UniProtKB/Swiss-Prot annotation:
The active site is at 238 (proton donor), 454 (nucleophile). Beta-glucosidase acting as a preformed defense system. Hydrolyzes the bisdesmosides avenacosides A and B to 26-desgluco-avenacosides exhibiting fungicidal activity. Can use beta-fucoside > beta-glucoside > beta-galactoside > beta-xyloside as substrates, but not alpha-glycosides, beta-thioglucosides and disaccharides. Optimum pH is 6.0. Belongs to the glycosyl hydrolase 1 family. It comes from Avena sativa (Oat). Inhibited by N-(3-Dimethylaminopropyl)-N'-ethylcarbodiimide hydrochloride (EDC). Homo- and heteromultimer with P60B in a 1:1 stoichiometry. Aggregates to form the fibrillar stromacentre. Keywords: Chloroplast, Disulfide bond, Glycosidase, Hydrolase, Plant defense, Plastid, Transit peptide. SUPFAM superfamilies: (Trans)glycosidases. This is Avenacosidase 1.
């Protein structure tokens, strides 16, 4: 999710927790104890939440034919694909020469901090079954596949001095060959949260400036070995979530600053300062990497950017203060990383409210940062209303997400929710928000070319959801995708003509970070009781129809490549 969820994977997502004083009805002011989350989340009883989801299911059955998007609504060059992330799908955590990652360490050391106490040691077994993933992409008719490379699978110790793992190089070359032979365009994310554990042990990874050189070296190895096959790169995935969850709340890796039982014991000073240090070093690593790419590897057709998680905040009430809260929420959520790449510094609101906890860029760093992207990826799942919090001496921030002085609310001042509950506890479907944020980014950030790099919703086991009788029947996901594709078309019609593609999150069910396997975002079901067998859900079959893949299959395009003749990985042989 890439949780979210892909990155948006926990109800204490950093953009959600903020000071509320005595307001006990705030959605996101929750105990870190999972049992308390499930009791208090969304201020709904389990039965009332189940009723709302059942109502949404009935609504999903009533989508009119003229509301269903068509592929020919979009320009011919507009890409449709699916996405995944290495840690969430590959498995083989200690095989093929791979070194441990921060997430390996997190899950093994603190299994109680994963909802179902699971880990991604096997995940969807894509290290061995990548050919089945490509087969699914081909059968669904996808143009493209966004996936991430595991840094510790390439550099097991995190550094060039520690040696390159050529088995890892071979694995990704085999995957790339299989994609290209089947007409599927690869989009690579260089970092999707799985830091080499060796760097955490040596110098606390992104809290130290040394990460800039080590990350740039790692990226250069990837450019060197895969650059002839890959022309579209993303340096980082969802830095906002990575910084907040990993170094603010500690609910994601590295997470060593939280004790067993999900009780967060991060010192307030660290929770207020460290996310900004990590974000700053991440931006410097991005700028250095893009500089190397542009000088030595870009060529005539290479492109590079960053993936941001976004929300289209709306004012909680029709008043000036909530409108200002909306602007601050966007600054802290999107502008934190995009404004330095557009104008060389953080948003003014962040400078004002964070003060000396927010690092400064040198002139040379600013020069490298500005325009350090050819495109921007945005991961969009849902939105919230922004409610103003008074800025006063009585309020003392406890964690970095308090700095925004804006509460994210599901309901507006009249009690109207931002959208229907679509099965995943934090996702309320609001396709208008996607259109709004696409238009806002055109006005506020210089109209960058954009890919929607993640968009989708999840099936949940438990947590107030109706019992899932058929994991392949996912009408809410179909409706969600249809409505958001329609919103993209509307944005294009309103002048947002630099949109380049849409990637559904996710291709297959995977390990969804702190939710383990309780949350399933895939359009393809993974049967973990039958060797991780891949089975298309109804949403995949709808996308197959949308992409016109049935006609292609009738013309025997599927399976034309020998790379899909088997399902195992081993030096490229099946």
């Amino acid at each position: 999710m890439a949780l979210l969820c892909s990155a948006l994977s926990n109800s204490t997502h950093p953009s959600f927790r903020s000071h509320i004083g005595a307001n006990s009805e705030n959605l996101w002011h929750l105990s870190a104890d999972p049992a308390q989350k499930s009791k208090r989340r969304c201020n709904l009883t389990l039965s009332s939440r189940a009723a709302r989801i059942s109502s949404a299911l009935e609504s999903a059955k009533q989508v009119k034919p003229w509301q269903v998007p068509k592929r020919d609504w979009f320009p011919p060059e507009f890409m449709f694909g699916a996405a995944s992330a290495a840690y969430q799908i590959e498995g083989a955590w200690n095989e093929g020469g791979k070194g441990p990652s921060s997430w390996d360490n997190f899950c093994h050391s603190h299994p109680d901090r994963i909802m179902d106490k699971s880990n991604a040691d096997v995940a969807a077994n894509s290290y061995y079954m990548y050919k089945e993933d490509v087969r699914m992409l081909k059968e669904i008719g996808m143009d493209s596949y966004r996936f991430s490379i595991s840094w510790p699978r390439i550099l097991p110790k995190g550094t060039l001095d520690g040696g390159i793992n050529h088995e890892g190089i071979q694995y990704y070359n085999d995957l790339l060959d299989c994609l290209i032979e089947n007409g599927i365009k690869p989009y690579i994310t260089l970092f999707h949260w799985d830091t080499p554990q060796a760097l955490a042990d040596e110098y606390k990874d992104f809290l130290d400036r040394r990460i800039v050189k080590d990350y740039t070296d790692y990226a250069t190895v990837c450019f060197e070995h895969f650059g002839d096959k890959v022309k579209n790169w993303f340096t980082f995935n969802e830095p906002h979530s990575f910084c907040g969850l990993g170094y603010g709340t500690g609910l994601h890796a590295p997470g060593a600053r939280c004790s067993a039982g999900m009780t967060c014991v991060i010192p307030e000073e660290d929770a207020l300062r460290n996310p900004y240090i990590v974000g700053h070093n991440l931006l410097l690593a991005h700028a250095e990497t893009v500089d190397v790419y542009n000088k030595f590897y870009k060529g005539d057709d290479g492109q590079i950017g960053m993936v941001l998680d976004v929300m289209a905040y709306e004012p909680y009430g029709n008043n000036f203060l909530d409108q200002q809260a909306q602007e601050r929420a966007i600054d802290f959520h999107i502008g934190w990383f995009l404004e330095p790449m557009v104008r060389g510094d953080y948003p003014f609101s962040m400078r004002s409210l964070v003060g000396d906890r927010l690092p400064f860029f040198t002139k040379s760093e600013q020069e490298k940062l500005v325009s350090s992207y050819d495109f921007v990826g945005i991961n969009y799942y849902t939105s919230r209303f922004a409610k103003h919090i008074d800025i006063s001496p009585e309020f003392i921030p406890k964690i970095n997400t308090d700095d925004v002085y804006s509460n994210p609310e599901v309901n507006d001042s009249n009690g109207i929710p931002i959208g229907p509950d679509v099965g995943m506890y934090f996702i309320y479907s609001y396709p208008k928000g996607l259109k709004n944020i696409l238009l806002r980014m055109k006005e506020k950030y210089g109209n960058p070319p954009i890919y929607i790099t993640e968009n989708g919703t999840a099936d949940m086991d438990g947590w107030g959801n109706p019992p899932m009788t058929d994991p392949l029947d996912d009408p809410l996901r179909i409706e969600y995708l249809q409505q958001h594709m329609t919103a993209i078309k509307e944005a294009i019609d309103l002048g947002r003509r630099t949109l380049r593609g849409h990637f559904t999150w996710s291709l297959i069910d995977n390990f969804e970070w702190s939710l383990g396997y309780l949350s399933r975002f895939g359009i393809v079901y993974i049967d973990r009781n039958d060797g991780c067998k891949r089975i298309m859900k109804k949403s995949a079959k709808w996308l197959k129809e949308f992409n016109g893949a049935t006609k292609k299959l009738n013309n025997k395009i599927l399976g034309a490549s020998s790379c899909c003749s088997g399902v195992t990985h081993g030096g490229g042989t099946a």
